[in-house]
Amino acid sequence: VDFLERLMALNSSGPVRTQRPTLETALKGGSAPVLPDPAPHTVLGTPVTGPWKPGQEHIVLGLGCFWGAEKLFWQLDGVESTSVGYAGGYTPNPTYREVCTGRTGHAEVVDVVWDPAVISLETILRVAMENHDPTQGDRQGNDVGAQYRSVIYPVGTPEQVAEQTAVARDVVSSYAERLKAAGYGDVTTEIIPLAETPAGEYYLAEDEHQQYLDKNPDGYCPVHATGVTCG
């Protein structure tokens, strides 16, 4: 996002839509993952890329800066693992620097793994929606760019994807009504199965971004909650 585009976004009262790349204009990316051998989760001690235990599911969520978002989820009972990465765009194996150019199409996201016997997807999605402003488009507070957009990318078997999509639509629709009653605009959250996004994949971010606020307790990454609850 260039200076002028960011300035205009910060002075906008409605949802922001920044310029996004196409398949032809997106950065070409790399041939290898930026984190090929991730370490175990620094808080939970679990693998961040599986294999998952029988019955566990995962979903990819974007709600602005992924540092603070990841911490929200690893603190929940029933969440078995989290990691941060990039999804929703075109560029394969992108770096953080590339994503920040706005030329990959990716959002900063968290891959959340949970045990449905302990915590429901509805609860996880309520936490996600209540802890950012999903009416801002390509922006969260002073963070401007498509990488900060609100997204929900269901993952798994066809049955799991269908169920996750249905739950996500219900939670977002209900929350949109509560936001509107509180004076907010339309919700801009994308709900798309991960496999149907342009690249169709979730790419792990670099090691320094994984569990960032555990490694850097004084790190800065505010949550842009509206104060409106899901009820």
Where are these regions (language model features)?
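Flexible coil/turn and secondary-structure edge motifs
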Residues: 1-231
